From Swiss-Prot:
Pfam families named in the record: F-box, FBA_1
InterPro entries, alphabetized: F-box-assoc_dom_typ1, F-box-assoc_interact_dom, F-box-like_dom_sf, F-box_dom, Gal_Oxase/kelch_b-propeller, SCF_F-box_component
Keyword Repeat found: yes
CDD domains: F-box_AtFBW1-like
Entry keyword set: Kelch repeat, Repeat
Annotated PANTHER family: BNACNNG10540D PROTEIN, F-BOX PROTEIN CPR30-LIKE
Domain of life of the source: Eukaryota
Protein name: F-box/kelch-repeat protein At3g44120
Ranges for domain F-box: 1-46
Length: 384
C-alpha cells in the first residue's frame, strides 16, 4: 500500500515543530527540504517561533577553537563533557585546511559572531547550516575594537546588524547586513559606565545587555547598572536590577541568560560571602522587568566569584554551573566548574580541557537555529 502524499503546507507545518538539530540530519533525505532549511526565510522565521529550543553550551579552548559541552544535571551527581572541536575553515588562508583562530564569540539568534586576535575582519557563522559571512574592517580596524550582533525585534523582516565599539573613539559604527555597508552613529549617547564589551554582554530578543559600573563613583560607593542596547532604536537604555544590586559596595556581579527569554544575575555582597542568583520575568512581555530570587549561596573561601566569570542557571532544577576562578599564579593543567543547588553543596566538575583566557573558562549558551544571514554582495561559504 502506497502512503498518501501530504500537502506541502502540512509538511512544512509539521517540520516547523522539529528541533533544529534534527532538521540538519534530514537535509540529505530530500533536495526540497534541503533548500527549505537553508534558503527559505519564511520557513526559518516560522521554525524559530514554533520549534522547541535546544540549548547547547559552548566553550573556547586555548587552541582558539569552539567546543560543545554536554551537561547532565540529572541524578545525584552532575557531570559535564567537552565534545570535539567544531570546524570553521578560514577561506583566506593559503592552506585549504586552516582553521580560523577564534578568541571571542558572541551569540545571537543561533548565529555566532567570531573575532580573531589582531585580525582585521570578523565572521558571522551559523554552525547548524554552515553558512558564513566574512566582514572586512579595512582602515577602521584597531586592537581596541569589540563587536556585538542584533536585530530590530519589532520588525517582521529580521535584518541583522553588527555594532562596533572602540575604546579609543567615542563614535560607534553599525554594519548593515542587508546593504553590506557601515555607517557611523555619531549622535549616540554612551552611558557613563565601565562596560566589559568582551566578556559580559549577552543578546536576548535581538538586543544586547551588559552590567556596567558607574565611572563617576569611587570605592566604596560603587554601584552596578544593567545597560541595554536596542538595535531597533539604536540607543542605549537601562533595566532595573534586583535589590541586592542597588546597594553600595559589592564583591562580584555577573550576568547570564536563561534559555532565550530571561536574564539572570549573580551578585556577591562586599561585606559577606552570601551570593544570590536572581532571574527576570520574560523579556519583552511587559514594559517593566521584574526579578525573582532563585538561589542563595554561601561559597567557601576558595570558591571565588570574580567579575566576568561565566555561569549558567537551570531555573527549573535551581542549579547553577559557575566557573572556578583561577589565580594568576596557579598552574593547573585543566579548568574546573562548580555545580551548586539549593543544598548549597559545591560539586567540583573537571572541565577536561584548557580554555582561552588562562584564568577561568568561558561558557556561551548557544541555541541552534535556522537563522539566515543576509549575503548582499558578499562571499559566503557552507561547510558540510
Amino acid at each position: 500500500m502506497t502512503l498518501p502524499e501530504l500537502p506541502k503546507d502540512l509538511v512544512e507545518e509539521i517540520l516547523c515543530f522539529v528541533p533544529a538539530t534534527s532538521l540538519k540530519r534530514l537535509r540529505s533525505s530530500c533536495k526540497e527540504w534541503n533548500r527549505l532549511f537553508k534558503d527559505d526565510k519564511r520557513f526559518a522565521r516560522k521554525h524559530i517561533e514554533k520549534a522547541a529550543k535546544q540549548f547547547q553550551p559552548l566553550t573556547l579552548t586555548k587552541n582558539y577553537r569552539i567546543c560543545p559541552i554536554n551537561v547532565n544535571l540529572h541524578g545525584t551527581t552532575p557531570s559535564l563533557e567537552v565534545k570535539n572541536e567544531v570546524s570553521l575553515v578560514d577561506p583566506h588562508s593559503k592552506n585549504s585546511a586552516a582553521q580560523f583562530n577564534i578568541d571571542r564569540v558572541f551569540h545571537c539568534d543561533g548565529l555566532l559572531l567570531c573575532t580573531s586576535q589582531k585580525d582585521s575582519r570578523f565572521v558571522v557563522w551559523n554552525p547548524l547550516t554552515g553558512v558564513t559571512k566574512w566582514i572586512e574592517l579595512g582602515d577602521r580596524y584597531n586592537e581596541g575594537m569589540a563587536f556585538i550582533l542584533g536585530y530590530d525585534n519589532k520588525s517582521c523582516n529580521k535584518s541583522y546588524k553588527a555594532m562596533s565599539f572602540n575604546y579609543l573613539d567615542k563614535d560607534s559604527e553599525i554594519y548593515e547586513f542587508s546593504s553590506d555597508s557601515w555607517r557611523v552613529i555619531d549622535d549616540i549617547i554612551k552611558p557613563p559606565h565601565y562596560m566589559d564589551y568582551f566578556r559580559e554582554c549577552f543578546s536576548l530578543k535581538g538586543n544586547t545587555y551588559w552590567l556596567g559600573i558607574d565611572r563617576r563613583r569611587r570605592p566604596p560607593d560603587l554601584r552596578i547598572t544593567l545597560i541595554k542596547f536596542d538595535f531597533g532604536t539604536e540607543r542605549f537604555g537601562y533595566v532595573s536590577l534586583p535589590p541586592p544590586c542597588q546597594v553600595h559596595g559589592f564583591e562580584a556581579s555577573n550576568l547570564s541568560v536563561v534559555g532565550d527569554e530571561k536574564l539572570s544575575v549573580l551578585v556577591q555582597g562586599g561585606s559577606t560571602s552570601k551570593t544570590e542568583v536572581w532571574v527576570t520575568s520574560k523579556i519583552g512581555e511587559a514594559n517593566v522587568v521584574s526579578w525573582s530570587k532563585v538561589l542563595s549561596l554561601y561559597p567557601k573561601p576558595d570558591v571565588g566569584f570574580w567579575h566576568g566569570l561565566s555561569f549558567l542557571l537551570d531555573e527549573e532544577k535551581k542549579v547553577v554551573l559557575c566557573c572556578k576562578s583561577k589565580g594568576w599564579m596557579e598552574e593547573e593543567d585543566e579548568e574546573n566548574v562548580y555545580s551548586v543547588g539549593e543544598d548549597t553543596k559545591f560539586i567540583l566538575l573537571n572541565f577536561g580541557v584548557q580554555t582561552i583566557g588562562g584564568y577561568s573558562p568561558i561558557i556561551v549558551n548557544y541555541v541552534p537555529s535556522l537563522g539566515q544571514i543576509e549575503l548582499a554582495g558578499s562571499k559566503r561559504k557552507r561547510d558540510y
